Regions:
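Conserved small/polar residues in nucleotide/adenosyl-binding loops
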Residues: 137-139
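Extended, subdomain-level signal for the structured scaffold at the beginning of enzyme domains
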Residues: 1-111, 123-135
Length: 139
């Protein structure tokens, strides 16, 4: 199978593991991943978050590592991508209301291209009318 080009949507304080591990795994099997964040340019830094279970009833949240996005958000043409992935963490809590992010997700939905998400990333899909329907989402 030829490598695909995947668009990853992130926001400030997206979960570090859900960015780094996904990106590395996709590269390992021959895919290209362009990571974008609204209002950021290629090379700009976003802060990530780390969640850990430290013996409490729920996880703790800590500052993660800096991450350099590798594509300018304003330059994204969804027609250039085979799939979209929405990382989780805190990022989706605010990028889900960005009309440009919603338009990107809507494109993938309407063209039948794969949409992947993990954890809080599903908030982005829920924010786009018609993408998540009862009995049709596989989470």
């Amino acid at each position: 199978m030829a490598g695909k080009t995947i668009l990853m949507l992130v926001g400030e304080f997206s979960e570090e593991y859900e960015i780094f591990v996904f990106e590395q795994a996709m590269h390992a099997v021959g895919h290209t991943v362009h990571v974008v964040c609204p209002d950021k340019k290629a090379g700009d830094v976003i802060k990530t978050s780390l969640h850990d279970f430290e013996g409490n009833q729920t996880y703790t949240e800590k500052l993660g590592h800096d991450y350099h996005v590798n594509k300018t958000f304003a330059d994204v043409d969804p027609a250039d991508y085979d799939a979209v992935y929405c990382a989780g963490g805190r990022g989706p809590e605010y990028i889900r209301i960005d009309k440009r992010v919603q338009a990107l997700v809507r494109h993938f939905h309407e063209t039948g291209k794969p949409i992947f998400t993990i954890c809080h990333g599903v908030q982005i899909l829920i924010a786009v009318d018609g993408v998540v329907q009862i009995g049709r989402a596989h989470v």
